[in-house]
């Protein structure tokens, strides 16, 4: 199609889109974005349209701003088989102008924690991913155990290789085996103003044996481009509504609330940010997903077989720096649109891995979660249900946050040995009436590849405890530990500084214990102001 110099905006209808919610508009939408990308023009949808996307064979690449103009988009995943490549093909992918590239690594290159220059030069300031093959970190134990991943991190550098002070090198690298360079100067794009409905698969209608397969679907909008903003997107789900109760231990006690996998599948994340700097998701409604389960053995009837949990997410991020999550609300896919506050079967609104400098502000969601580490997180002006689940390091700053349920305000993820090598600040926050612990973790003699720090320093300035009783820490399975520098050494907090801690009335002062495990925390200094 010859656009001509007079064309200032690309419309789907110019390429044959119907927008009636029935006709498959995939080809027209793809052609429109291809033309927009080539011409560097924005895309504008029809306000009253309902665009059905059903026969997508590959992702639709977006590189320019897109205003969906309040239209509805229907992503029909209902017929996608779990073995199909489409299972992890995002409907839209916001791509950079220049793809990431691997560069030659000088033989014998080593890097140290806190090193201020990587010893390499670059064409321009950029983001780089450093990797060390075979040196595993974030080994995981428990139901979903694995052997970890190669040590890696994302940092910002200038053309002379100087490390940006906001992304200091976190680890020691005896051997650097790979460096990947990502552009950070992509022209800003904004994409949004839409209602998007995902029609989820009904897997057992496609494959009767699906129930015993551990697999995730990756569909929705993926962002790989720096300086990208997703805004005003209201996401909903159709077809995920059959809740089941499970007695995993056979003791007559229901200990898992999940979803029947005949009626839906677990998702990696509808919104998925990966390998980008300064990306934002704002002013949007997120869908709370039901947790799922799978049979650990070959068949459900295998003796001793159990179901394991699979979280399902509407938002996920990997290898991102300066990610902002602003003004987000999580809701159920019910007629009432009820906001979720602490329902375990709907816990999975967010997951993340290897991100740095993450901001969550003015959000009403179930949880902030970092699976394989976050370095620097700031959570402010939020109401959270399932909670704050973190491992990693740097600084965790939490201000004006109300945690409405659960037994602990902050959970250090127990499946990664509750490692957080950094400081925690809690300011002007409120804990729900069942909550009696500020920070909870679990420790076993399990080396996840990192030193076992259970936070370094804790500062509390303003905390209302609705339960009326409180302890700063509770670390499960805590036992006398080695004082030598072996991998099983546990590093407990050095210092706690607390002020303005009150009971539910906000007036009666509370003086929390460090922990019920007093002997183990004997070296931790507590300062009450």
What would you call each of these model-derived segments?
Residues 26, 33, 38-87, 132-151, ...:
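N-terminal extracellular ligand-recognition/capping segment immediately after the signal peptide
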Residues 1-9:
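Glycine-rich, low-complexity segments
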Residues 146-154, 158-207, 212-214:
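Small/polar beta-strand repeat architecture
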Residues 55-56, 75-80, 200-206, 238-269, ...:
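Short glycine/acidic-rich loop motifs that flank beta-strands on beta-rich extracellular proteins
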